[in-house]
């Protein structure tokens, strides 16, 4: 990659494309994916992720009672941490409580409201852009200075690849994810007639505040068994347990456009989200009036509240060790 060190703190955009006409745009604000345009056989291009036309609207969206986090990188810890509290190396850490008494998606600002820095870019075949954010020690009360790099790649096989890498100056906890809302009919449509598949036999059991109890729910006779594809649910906010990183973890299919998206990840879970109450407040891209069925999130990640459950995969990143997370969104037409 060419080193194009960028210390500009104001919002900037990077655009990547491939030989088939796929095009993505990434803002350094929240390292957010702001558009993902796919050419259909008809010649029409559709944007399959929700978002806003201006960075000011992205910022305003975080003032809503339930911020949508459109397209953002979420951290230092994605999902909820009960009471905003965890123990590490025998010491209690109290995080900012921004979701009732719990901490959600990193706290008051997290990584989604930071101006990241573009440090590398490749605009030829298999184009890519790498963004970096350095989180100071005890930002949001997380221990350790954490250097995070996120690389967005657009392959010539029509894959959006997101790779996350991080290293900490002290032992810390980490759980990064990507928060795009996908709609394969185009961002102005609805997902209600799209088919969802999730390769999972269990979900995390949660309490009324959506905090994991530490137990699991078998999906054999459950409405959220999506091993065989079926219509997207009207509302869902659940973490599905993944057991095999070598298979397609989830997929979404649009009969209207004959377009399929497959999700492959090395993470132990995928949080599926449809719904929310932030809609009708701010106009979406191209004047779109978004609603709870406008999009669906595929948040590949560790389990929420893992630091407080001995039987969940460890969320601890030891001093000097490397965190690595890779997720592929593969698109197929016809």
Indicate where each model-derived feature is located:
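An exposed, glycine/acidic-rich loop-and-rim segment of catalytic or binding clefts
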Residues: 1-334
């Amino acid at each position: 990659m060419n080193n194009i060190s960028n210390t500009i703190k104001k919002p900037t955009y990077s655009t990547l494309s491939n030989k088939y006409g796929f095009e993505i745009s990434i803002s350094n604000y929240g390292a957010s994916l702001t558009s993902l345009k796919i050419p259909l056989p008809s010649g029409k291009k559709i944007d399959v992720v929700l978002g806003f036309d201006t960075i000011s609207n992205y910022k305003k969206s975080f003032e809503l009672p339930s911020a949508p986090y459109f397209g953002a990188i979420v951290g230092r810890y994605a999902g909820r941490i009960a009471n905003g509290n965890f123990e590490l190396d025998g010491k209690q850490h109290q995080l900012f409580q921004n979701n009732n008494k719990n901490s959600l998606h990193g706290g008051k600002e997290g990584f989604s409201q930071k101006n990241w820095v573009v440090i590398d870019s490749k605009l030829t075949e298999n184009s890519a852009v790498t963004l970096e954010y350095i989180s100071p020690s005890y930002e949001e009360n997380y221990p350790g200075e954490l250097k995070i790099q996120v690389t967005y790649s657009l392959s010539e096989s029509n894959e959006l690849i997101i790779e996350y890498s991080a290293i900490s100056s002290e032992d810390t906890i980490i759980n990064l994810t990507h928060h795009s809302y996908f709609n394969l009919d185009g961002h102005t449509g609805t997902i209600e007639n799209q088919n969802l598949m999730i390769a999972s036999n269990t979900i995390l059991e949660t309490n009324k505040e959506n905090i994991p109890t530490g137990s699991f729910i078998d999906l054999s006779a459950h409405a959220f068994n999506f091993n065989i594809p079926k219509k997207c649910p009207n509302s869902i906010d659940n973490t599905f347990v993944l057991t095999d990183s070598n298979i397609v973890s989830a997929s979404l299919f649009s009969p209207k456009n004959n377009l399929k998206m497959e999700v492959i990840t090395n993470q132990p879970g995928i949080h599926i989200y449809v719904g929310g109450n932030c809609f009708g407040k701010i106009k979406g891209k191209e004047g779109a009036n978004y609603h709870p069925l406008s999009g669906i999130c595929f948040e590949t990640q560790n389990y929420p509240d893992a630091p407080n459950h001995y039987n969940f995969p460890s969320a601890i990143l030891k001093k000097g060790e490397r965190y690595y997370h890779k997720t592929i969104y593969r698109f197929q037409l016809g």
